[in-house]
Amino acid sequence: AQYGRELLSCVPENPDQSILDLGCGTGTLTHALLEKSASVTGLDSSPEMIAKARQLYPGMDFRVLDARLMPWRNRFDIVFSNAALHWIPDHGTLLNAVSRVLKPQGKLVCEFGARLNILRIREAFRTALERRSLPYTTRFYFPAAEEYGSVLEQAGLRPETMKEFDRPTPLKGGPDGLRNWACQFFREDLNNLHEEQRIQIFKEMEDSLKDELWDGSQWVADYRRIRVTAAR
């Protein structure tokens, strides 16, 4: 959420506008968006995340919903999203839904993983799986800016700004930071493995990444981001 506050600067202030926070998680940035507008809705596909958001920010409008199935039409002036859209592989369907819920001249303001995002970590994980003859499935969408411009246009959205940039990001947890992060990010691949297998995979990842991503006190993930604003 601390990095998401940079993205907030791309959202204009207007008390009369309506904002949708897509992939809102536990609602930290949804609540911060009240500085920009009095009408803010948070949406996430995780019931657990939304339950926490409602607990933290009672009285705010939070919905459990798949972003590709949003029911509204011409409803929001701004669709905002931070660090969420890479979890949705099918951006054609997603952006058609975003275009549908935006009002005419409404804007998409988003940031998520770009091409080469966590490349070193993904390759270390893939290698550890392949060593055990286990398949690695790409479950994320990390586009390049030039590629994403075409995807936006096909959904009826006009790109205004697109920027790719590196964002080395410290992982919480000290020596356990990488494996804690991997448990979350690669959970679908790890869920079917025995605990001993998971521990061995984490150890191999740590050994192969230590020279590049361990700074002596914490793991620093090789994040790369794309920041986009587009208009309907």
Protein language model features and the residues they cover:
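Conserved class I S-adenosyl-L-methionine
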Residues: 107-131
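Class I SAM-dependent methyltransferase SAM/SAH-binding core
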Residues: 20-69
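Short alpha-helix
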Residues: 141-155
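A short acidic, Gly/Pro-enriched loop at the edge of an enzyme's catalytic core
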Residues: 68-79
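Conserved alpha-helix/loop element of class I SAM-dependent methyltransferases that forms part
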Residues: 1-17
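C-terminal helical/coil "lid" or tail adjacent to the Rossmann-like core of SAM-dependent
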Residues: 160-215
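A short glycine-rich, Lys/Arg-flanked "PGG" loop and its adjoining helix->strand segment in the class I
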Residues: 92-107
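A short SAM/SAH-binding and catalytic strip from SAM-dependent methyltransferases
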Residues: 78-91
